[in-house]
């Protein structure tokens, strides 16, 4: 059995992954708050964890993995979006507009993630379906002295949990000293966070022992993961921006409500995304959603390839040049595997790279080597471990040009040139290929020809 090693944010070490129950590996990914389209940064953890799930199912069996990704469908941002629509004259009550918006946004999210080749999780719980479980968990926290009710709010008593701050490497006193926020009068301590808050008549709300209200964000994930995965499960994942306060708060409330469990054993966090070397933001004019890219004609498979080309723990820079290069590579690879059956399993080099802390860049390097060797079956099997070259994602491309004869011709000329030290024939063929829009890659692994965005079959040498 191949050993998987993952970098655990909680311990700050790369560790051998040892499932609690090898017959049922359980993992949870924080999903979207459904008020608007998913931007590219939202897609990165989805694609990364999709590869992890594929790896786990390959090694342990398809039926031995339970993957949960939630929808946060009760949130102030959702309320604000619906209120803006109501004020703009959209007919319907605020409650109806909120329901319409969340339903619409979940549909958008599914369509966009499907376009990136991300397989649907086993469970996609919606927060509003677990309100009763959240209330029960809050009652448990109050009974244990970890939470208190005041002015219609319920707050978690942060200092009641001695390990608070260990995930993010912060101390409570340092956090208070560095805070620049006005402390709400109903808080005992500035660091205490909301588990439940009151709702007025127009906003979504549910009856509770503390009056009509709605849950805080953090309790939602704790309640849903407990109900679907238990008090101890294997992996919790999300973007590094969620490490604090969201994940820190999840740990605190879950471990206090269920003191005999570990909550999540392994914490995986992907780094942030940049665009052309700068932070993605609306103020810089470089903010875009997954749908924006798809509507620009960038195929979902190309977006996926670019997302996987950088290790998940490194900041990822999206550039137009990377997208063009990815498209050229995928065109070449699809040409190589046209009409080919995949090998019985992915090459050991691909599996080994993914087992080493999800080194997707290393796995792609192994695929490049197979492509250079003309190993279509191996390339296809390995690429599918990454969710690439699948039938579902192939609709964007016509059947790729068959460059195998030219590849063999270049390889033969190159071999002769190495013996004779005369590379004139190699250079001449290379130039004609470049003129036809073909990228020529030559390495110790062999020759690889990739149709580029300016590819013109009419200019290919005969």
Swiss-Prot record:
ATP binds at residue 282. Binds 1 zinc ion per subunit. Keywords: Aminoacyl-tRNA synthetase, ATP-binding, Cytoplasm, Ligase, Metal-binding, Nucleotide-binding, Protein biosynthesis, Zinc. It comes from the Bacteria. It is an enzyme of class 6 (ligase). One of its GO terms (biological process) is cysteinyl-tRNA aminoacylation. InterPro entries: Cys-tRNA-ligase (IPR015803), Cys-tRNA-synt_Ia_DALR (IPR015273), Cys-tRNA/MSH_ligase (IPR024909), Rossmann-like_a/b/a_fold (IPR014729), tRNA-synt_1_cat_dom (IPR032678), tRNAsynth_Ia_anticodon-bd (IPR009080). Its main location: cytoplasm. Its EC number is 6.1.1.16. Transmembrane segments: none annotated. A motif ('KMSKS' region) lies at residues 279-283. Its cofactor is Zn(2+). The keyword Kinase does not apply. SMART domains: DALR_2 (SM00840). GO terms for cellular component: cytosol. It is found in: Cytoplasm. The keyword Zinc applies. Monomer. Belongs to the class-I aminoacyl-tRNA synthetase family. This is Cysteine--tRNA ligase. It comes from Paracoccus denitrificans (strain Pd 1222).
């Amino acid at each position: 059995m191949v050993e998987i090693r993952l970098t655990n944010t909680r311990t700050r070490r790369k560790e051998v992954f040892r499932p609690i129950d090898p017959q049922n590996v359980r993992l949870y990914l924080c999903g979207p708050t459904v008020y608007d389209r998913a931007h590219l940064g939202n897609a990165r953890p989805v694609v990364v964890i999709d590869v992890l799930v594929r790896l786990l199912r390959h090694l342990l069996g398809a039926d031995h993995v339970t993957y949960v990704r939630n929808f946060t469908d009760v949130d102030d941002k959702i309320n604000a979006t619906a209120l803006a629509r109501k004020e703009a004259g959209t007919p319907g009550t605020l409650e109806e507009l909120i329901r319409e918006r969340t339903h619409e946004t979940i549909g958008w999210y599914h369509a966009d993630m499907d376009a990136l080749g991300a397989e649907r999780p086993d469970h996609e719980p919606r927060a509003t379906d677990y309100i009763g479980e959240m209330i029960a968990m809050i009652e448990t926290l109050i009974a244990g002295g970890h939470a208190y009710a005041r002015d219609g709010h319920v707050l978690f008593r942060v200092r009641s949990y001695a390990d608070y701050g260990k995930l993010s490497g912060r101390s409570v006193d340092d956090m208070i000293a560095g805070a620049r926020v006005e402390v709400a009068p109903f808080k005992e301590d500035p660091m205490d966070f909301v588990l439940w808050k009151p709702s007025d008549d127009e906003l979504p709300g549910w009856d509770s022992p503390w009056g009509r209200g709605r849950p805080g964000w953090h309790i939602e994930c704790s309640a849903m993961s407990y109900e679907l995965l238990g008090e101890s499960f294997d992996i919790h994942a999300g973007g590094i921006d969620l490490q604090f306060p969201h994940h820190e708060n999840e740990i605190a409330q879950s471990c206090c409500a269920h003191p005999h469990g570990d909550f999540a054993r392994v914490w995986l966090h992907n780094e942030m995304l940049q665009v052309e070397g700068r932070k993605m933001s609306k103020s810089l004019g470089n903010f875009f959603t997954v749908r924006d890219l798809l509507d620009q004609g960038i195929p979902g498979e190309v977006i996926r390839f670019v997302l996987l080309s950088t290790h998940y723990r490194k900041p990822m820079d999206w550039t137009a040049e990377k997208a063009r290069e990815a498209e050229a590579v995928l065109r070449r690879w699809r040409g190589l595997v046209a009409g080919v059956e995949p090998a019985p399993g992915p090459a050991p080099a691909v599996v080994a790279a993914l087992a080493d802390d999800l080194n997707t860049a290393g796995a792609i390097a192994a695929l490049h080597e197979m492509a250079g060797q003309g190993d279509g079956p191996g390339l296809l099997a390995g690429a599918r471990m990454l969710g690439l070259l699948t039938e579902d994602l192939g609709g964007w491309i016509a059947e790729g040009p068959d460059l195998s004869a030219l590849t063999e011709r270049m390889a033969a000329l190159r071999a002769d040139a190495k013996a004779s030290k005369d590379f004139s024939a190699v250079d001449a063929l290379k130039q004609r290929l470049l003129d036809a829009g073909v990228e020529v890659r030559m390495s110790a692994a062999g020759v690889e020809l990739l149709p580029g965005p300016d590819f013109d079959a009419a200019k290919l040498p005969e």
